[in-house]
From Swiss-Prot:
Compositionally biased tracts (Pro residues): 733-747, 809-818
Record's comment describing the protein's domains: In the autoinhibited state, the SH3 domains are bound to the concave surface of the F-BAR domain and prevent promiscuous membrane binding.
Protein name: Protein nervous wreck
InterPro entries: AH/BAR_dom_sf (IPR027267), F_BAR (IPR031160), FCH_dom (IPR001060), FCHSD_SH3_1 (IPR035460), SH3-like_dom_sf (IPR036028), SH3_domain (IPR001452)
Subunit structure: Homodimer. Interacts (via SH3 domain 1) with WASp. Interacts (via SH3 domain 1) with shi/dynamin. Interacts (via SH3 domain 2) with Dap160. Interacts (via F-BAR domain) with SH3PX1. Interacts (via SH3 domain 2) with Snx16. Identified in a complex with Syn and Syt1.
GO BP term, example: regulation of actin filament polymerization
Gene this protein is translated from: nwk
PROSITE patterns hit by this protein: F_BAR, SH3
Superkingdom per UniProt: Eukaryota
Gene Ontology MF annotations: phosphatidylinositol-3,4-bisphosphate binding; phosphatidylinositol-4,5-bisphosphate binding; phospholipid binding
The keyword DNA-binding belongs to this UniProt entry's keyword annotation: no
Reported phenotype of the disruption mutant: No visible phenotype in adults at room temperature, but flies rapidly loose coordination and become paralyzed within three minutes at 38 degrees Celsius. Larvae display overgrowth of neuromuscular junctions, with increased numbers of synaptic boutons and increased frequency and complexity of axon branching. The synaptic area and the number of reserve and readily releasable synaptic vesicles are decreased.
Amino acid sequence: MQPPPRKGNYVKFLKNLHTEQVAKLQLKNQHECDLLEDIRQFTIKRSAVEKSYSESLLKISSQYLNKKIPNIPDIKMEGMEERWNMWSVWRTVLEENEKLARARLAAIEVFQQQIADEAKVLRDYKLAIAKRSLAGIVNVQKELHLSVGDVDKTKKSYFDEEHCAHDVRDKARDIEEKLKKKKGSFFQSITSLQKNSARVTSRKELLEEKSSGARNDYVLSLAAANAHQNRYFTVDLQTTMTTMENYVFERVAEYLMLMGRTELLTCSATQNSFGKIRDQAQQLTREYNLQCCYLFYPVLKQHIQYDFEACDNDPVRKVTAEHESAAETLTKEAKNLAGRVVKENASIRENAKKLALCQSLRDSGQRTDPNDPNGPDLDTKIEEFRDQIRRSETEKTKAEACLQCLRDGGINVDEWVQEAENMGVQELTRSASSISMRTDASGQGENPSSDSFYDSDKEETQAAAQTKPKQEQQLSRDRTFSDSEDEPEVRPSAAAASSAAAASSSMMASSAGGWDDPTEVNWGAGEEEDDKDEPIVPEPKEAIFKCTALYSYTAQNPDELTIVENEQLEVVGEGDGDGWLRARNYRGEEGYVPHNYLDIDQETAGSAFNGTSGNQLRSQISFSSVDYTVDNEDQTVDSMQSPDQVSVIMAPQKRVKSDVEWCIALYDYDATAEDELTFEEGDKIKIITKTAHGVDDGWWEGELDGKFGNFPSLVVEECDEMGEPLSEGGDESPPPTAAPTFALPPAPALPPEYAHELELELTEDMFGSQDTADEDSGYIPNGAAAPSIPPPVLIQEPGMEDDLSDDGQPPPSLPPPQLAKAGGSAPGSGSKVEKGAAAGGANTLNLGMAQIIVTAATPMVEDGADKSFPPVGESDAQPVEPVSKEQPAEVAKKPDIAPKPLAKVAPQSAPAKEGNAGVRPVVSITLTEYPSCDAEDQQSFSEGTDSASVADVPVLQDAEDPFNEKAKGESGDGSGFEANFEANFDANFDDAFAGIGGGGGGGGGGGEQSNELDINGEAAGEAIVSGSAAGDEDIEAPKQVVGGRASIPEELDSNQLAHYHEHEIYYVDYSHGQL
């Protein structure tokens, strides 16, 4: 056959070639079957002429010698051992039988039993299997036609685009030459030439970009087609030929060897003749016979490969990413191809396992699968699995060829391949689902749609229909290889969602009486238990405790459970340890749910899970636990906080890092080399080094049971000496039952008349107007308090356990904090703090700092790392109200004392719940006492406060220097505070304070400052600090804003966003006339 033409349709030529190949394969099989039939008939007829052996054998031998035998020549080369194909040997057999016809009387019976019968069975099987094999190769050829058809399409498009681009390039070159010569025609000026040059240049760039894209498509389709051709020739065609042969060469050789051996035993007279037949038959091999067949049928040896055909001397021969759009498209293509390779590898492994299982069942005598007796037989299943493996291998080969093509073009495909392989390893612990919710122990993950639910009144078949897996779609070449978009998220109707929410609300109301208050935990008992060294008690498997669903979740796998927001559930197990728990609903259905979707009942959990294992489970679903890092580390959020119940936020006990590192095995691993370790899941390994080969290639060196070796880091997880996994920040989670303590400075001793008055007013503001809130709509009128006031959030830093006694009260040396009125009442009501005399004649003008704590519900997931705070356009929706003259709160100013550091609070993620309308933040102010000031400062303060006019106080702008670098250099006492502040809030200062109406500033001669905090859409309070100190500079204390909009999920609608913007946590530090 001639090679494919350089010009023309590839598909047409390929179809003709494949048709001829199928015909020759069928002819080859027919020849083999004819040969088997000839051997069988020959043996039978020899047996029939036993009595007249000599005469009849001579006649028969001559008959078959005269028959037209395929003249497949032998390969004869100088210096090469003489060899024969099976047709030549058969011809030798006939010739020798013609001479030795009389010696075959004794061997007729042996021939009849061992040759004739088996040859008939083999021939019938070959005829039957040839039909299936030829049908299969035709289907494979059709797939190859599609791939080559893509080459024709992309080639045509490339030639068209390149022709256009080439013409425009020539035209642009002519215009540029005319411009260089500055010579126009009689009817054309230089200006018109310049305009034409600009127009033609822009058109040239556009057409070159199109030509480049068409060339890239052509190169990619060419690579895929060539890879498919390689696969077809080396695998599909060879497999079909082997299947059709069914060891016919070996069987024929066996038959002929048997003939020769029998004849030698029966007749010494024929020893020489049949010795020759035997020797030739022993040299029969499939390889040599195929070589002879290839020589006789050259079309079977024709292997087609396509080369890139450049258009108009195009110098580019590979994929290029010269243009931005091409680079982006090729990068996306590389990512999709890498994902397809990993996917096809997984499919090959899975189908190979199924194929091995079916083959073992067939070898054991089974005809059908015992697990599927009504299904197809094992042979059909085996063929299906083989075909699936073949398809997967073909797709994998094409994808790898395209990846290599992209790699040759300078595209970074190795990064995507590594990422796809890592994702494949990480997803081994869960069943395959592209939209299943996967979370870690910290509760961070993709927040599912808030309106996902199930209706308990519907039939179970509807729920099963929602989770039914979709059939895999066949993707074309120009589509993405990723199948993540083939499974859209199922969203029920709004009416069904509202009915389910109403049903769950009524169920919540009936069971709310049994909920525990997390603030009533016996902290003293918890401390005593922590001090004791108790043995680790394994968690009982049958422990059951109640919990509440914080969000709705639709099951994506058969082993998961669909839950509705506020639904009462029972947790019956810890799941597989990757952020899932096994729960049971009121209908008795059990399944896995994400643990951070649950709000656990602490009392029930405490009674059900005792000891260390209980604490571990409770820490997974704790109401709130916040990690704090001080030494320039990012703040992390470990879990979620229920908006209905506020728990104690604690700073964790920092882990004392050891010089020895440990890791625990997540999977079994068998060593593949002498320098590797073999271990099983759960083994604890001591890490020697993380750069086993001198570079960070993902292999670690460790010690297990006294044996040293290397192992992959992907199958292990770092842990401590006890085998407990380490958290992301390297610190252990704090014990959930630790008691809250205060770490604030001593409170000032206010005059009795003011202290009593402030306490009464604060109590009235917090609890006086609870019944006026609109619970149904979630709207809180001005001046109205929330229906329920959660306790304030308290802070505990490491080393502060000694600040409280066992009963939770401050020690005698630390006076209790005094309460001051917070700006939570209606406008027009306020309080004024004035100086007074303390007992013992000491100077009582010691107010230097005030701390405002607002506790409110905030969303659970912090996905607003790249959002501004507040969001764009929100500052206009909530304008800052002017300062009221009736709401000043004047405090003393001491310029020589820097503020002491406050305990810092990290943003606490809490779920977004629309049902908690009416929850309103609680504000508490703690006044901090500083050392007494002298008489001159008191006089200066008195004069400044009496003469200051609140009406003249301007609204502060955003601070340009929030950290007051100059003040940091002059203040020694405040250095610790600012170091801690910068470490925790420098990263998110711009996002946290962008758009807030209010600021701070200070000058050398003192000043007046104000700040308004917008809480629940109204002015919640103002803090105005005035003072005068000539020649002294004010030290501006940095501001802290914790929580708020930065962690609101993206899928909340506009009214939900407005609701959560009303619940913020602000910290304001007042010291020396600064906000």
